[in-house]
Structures are given as C-alpha cells and as structure tokens.
Amino acid sequence: MHMPSGTQWLIILLIVVLLFGAKKIPELAKGLGKGIKTFKDEMNTEDDKKITQEDAQKIEKINEKDILAKENNEEVKKA
C-alpha cells in the first residue's frame, strides 16, 4: 500500500471536519496525543522492568559463582 497523496489528504481532512466539526478537532488531536504519550511511557516502563530482571539474574549467577569459589578455596586451605 502507498501513502495517500496531497489531494487525498485534503479529502480526508474535509470528511473529518464535516463529521466532528471544527471545534472538536483540537480536542480529538489532544486526546490522541495523550494516548500516544501514555502508550510510549508504558512501553518504556516494560523495557525497564525487563532489563532489571535480566540484571538481577546475572547478579544472582555471579553471586553463586563467588560463593562456590570461596567454598572451594576454603576446602583447599583446610586440606
């Protein structure tokens, strides 16, 4: 599919004005903008949570390795 040309955009705009009236269009645009902003914010929040969980798992693995290394080192010293 291709994007509408300039004339097609004008026809679409005219239909929107006829359907909603000139006074409602700024309100609709404002609501649409807020909706898009909220969506983007939620997407960023989900990405942050995912990164945090991944980091926590990496730290947990590193801690397990450190504990095992210390246990092995203590066993070597005792022997």
Swiss-Prot record:
Keywords: Cell inner membrane, Cell membrane, Membrane, Protein transport, Translocation, Transmembrane, Transmembrane helix, Transport. It is a single-pass membrane protein. The chain crosses the membrane at residues 1-21. One of its GO terms (cellular component) is TAT protein transport complex. One of its GO terms (molecular function) is protein transmembrane transporter activity. Its main location: membrane. It is found in: Cell inner membrane. Part of the twin-arginine translocation (Tat) system that transports large folded proteins containing a characteristic twin-arginine motif in their signal peptide across membranes. TatA could form the protein-conducting channel of the Tat system. Belongs to the TatA/E family. NCBIfam families: tatAE. This is Sec-independent protein translocase protein TatA. The gene is tatA.
